[in-house]
């Protein structure tokens, strides 16, 4: 089996991007070790701190954030860092070519119950000049790499550099990521959907109607039975979509009118959209393609609908948009 390093060389990407991806991968091995040790290392439970989103930070949120931040600052290829756990952007190397946005431990509320968690990352080109928040405000189409590491029964890395999506599995005996799927592909159709049903009464009318029709199954307008899945960690739900198709959505809701969206654009929606589109799926807010969004803040939130192309199209029809037709040239 090809190692991650061998695979990156075969992709003919720049040596600096290759170095950065290997740094992210190597740090994820350390995070995997910390996650596995859990209560044995005294790293479970919450702190008394909150992040910029007002969410209570788990001990491992802070530990994993510091691990990634320290590794990227020392890498030499990174100009700046944006993290879910940092209020502001963090400067790294003044000569760095890249900006890295990451969620160090997605699904951290699952940690204390020994369920799935992961790391999500996005790599952008660093513009010339002084590093500010504005440096990061680039549309998702500018990403040069994106991926996630899933800490489950196996530790897996899903990666794209714009040349499809490759899946690597960490060999615990050699501590190397080995290529186990050279071309992940999202099926066009699906019979599975993932959504937090407890928020149903707060959704917009198009999403309410769409989900209601799925639940009606064969006796409804879709004339097909669907199963619901929900892991409560985006990284786990998107991994399932990449492996066997499906649609994952965290839609607009009015539960808190000041925060109508849950997921963050820069380090959750954009990297996952890049992966899903590279695997043949689609990713939208319901009203626009996620990677077309021009960001206004590093912690900006958006609605997310992504997964199997035909099912995303079906959902978008409920929102009054038909993306199934290719634009005329």
From Swiss-Prot:
Gene3D superfamilies named among the record's database cross-references: 3.40.190.80, Fructose-1,6-Bisphosphatase, subunit A, domain 1
Q: How is the cofactor bound?
A: Binds 2 magnesium ions per subunit.
Q: Where in the cell is it found?
A: Cytoplasm
A GO term from the CC aspect: cytosol
List where this protein forms a coiled coil. Answer: none
Q: In which pathway does it act?
A: Carbohydrate biosynthesis; gluconeogenesis
Q: Name one GO molecular function term.
A: magnesium ion binding
* Pfam families assigned to the protein according to its UniProt record, in alphabetical order: FBPase, FBPase_C
Q: Which residues bind substrate?
A: 106-109, 196, 262
Taxonomic superkingdom: Bacteria
The cofactor(s) it depends on are: Mg(2+)
Q: Where does Mg(2+) 2 bind?
A: 103, 106, 268
The name this protein carries in UniProt is Fructose-1,6-bisphosphatase class 1
Originating organism? Shewanella halifaxensis (strain HAW-EB4)
Gene this chain is encoded by: fbp
